[in-house]
C-alpha cells in the first residue's frame, strides 16, 4: 500500500470534519457525554480494527477519547487510515 501525497491527504481531510494531520498521522479527539459512552465506542472501533487488521492508537482521558491513525508498516498515512477514520466517524455517530 502506497503512502498518500500531501494533496491527497488534504483533500481527504476536507471530508473528515474533526480530523487533523499531525506529521505522519491523522488525529481526532472526541468528547463523549459520559465515560462509559467513550469506552463503548472504543470497544466497537477495536472490534472493527481487529477485523481489518489495522489498529489505531487510542488514548482515553475521562470522557475524551483521542484516535491517532498511521500505517506504521508504510511509515505514514495510507488509504487504510482514511477508511478507518471514516469508520470511526460512523461508529461514534459524528
Curated annotation (Swiss-Prot):
SUPFAM superfamilies: PCD-like (SSF55248). InterPro entries: PCD_sf, Pterin_deHydtase. The keyword Ribosomal protein does not apply. Keywords: Lyase. The keyword Lyase applies. It is an enzyme of class 4 (lyase). One of its GO terms (biological process) is tetrahydrobiopterin biosynthetic process. Its EC number is 4.2.1.96. GO terms for molecular function: 4-alpha-hydroxytetrahydrobiopterin dehydratase activity. CDD domains: PCD_DCoH. It catalyses: (4aS,6R)-4a-hydroxy-L-erythro-5,6,7,8-tetrahydrobiopterin = (6R)-L-erythro-6,7-dihydrobiopterin + H2O. Belongs to the pterin-4-alpha-carbinolamine dehydratase family. This is Putative pterin-4-alpha-carbinolamine dehydratase.
